[in-house]
Amino acid sequence: RFLADTYDFETRKKMLSRPEGRDPGIWKALSTELGLTCAPFAEAHGGMGGGAIENMIMMEELGKVIAIEPWLQTVVIGGGALKAAGGALADATIPAIISGDAIIAFAYAEPQGRYNLADIGTTAKQDGAGYVLNGHKAVVYAAPWATHLLVTARTGGSRRERAGVEMFLIAAN
């Protein structure tokens, strides 16, 4: 009901014409007022313990209004990667996704890759306790709004090889 009342086509067009290309208040409302961003996460992180079904329901509702909210990038892809990885980074970032304070942009596509997920030329070289990433990404949806970038980079293997690709969560500031 919230989306139907908030996201009529004319309002969507106005949001897209704003300098930031969206209304940040809607994302905050989805997370804080309605609590929807907590649905697919474990109770230990402040979630409701849902999963794929809850994500599918939400994606369907967002699709009905052609929403421009970063649900897929932040909750499904970013949150899913964090859930799978676990650990301190997940413990710190998932609650920020749930509260609406974190928006994740998934930086995976590269100009030469033509959406082949294994065609990654971006490299990650260990440097002390961290990594230095070097390369180019293209079409990173939600990047202008993101607090974090989830970047694919190669730590080993050749450019089109499936092995040797890792994901790095990087603060966007």
Model-derived regions: residue spans:
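Short, solvent-exposed loop/turn elements at beta->coil junctions and helix N-caps
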Residues: 44, 109-113, 138-139
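Active-site-adjacent elements of ketosynthase-type condensing enzymes
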Residues: 112-120
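A short, Trp-centered hydrophobic/proline-enriched beta-strand micro-motif
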Residues: 100-109
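Amphipathic, small/basic residue-rich leader segments at the start of a protein or domain
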Residues: 1-72, 92, 96
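N-terminal glycine-rich flavin-associated loop
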Residues: 67-88
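Buried hydrophobic positions in well-ordered alpha/beta secondary-structure cores of metabolic enzymes
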Residues: 3, 35, 42, 58, ...
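A structural signal for short hydrophobic beta-strand segments in well-ordered beta-sheet cores
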Residues: 122-125
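A short core secondary-structure module
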Residues: 130, 134-173
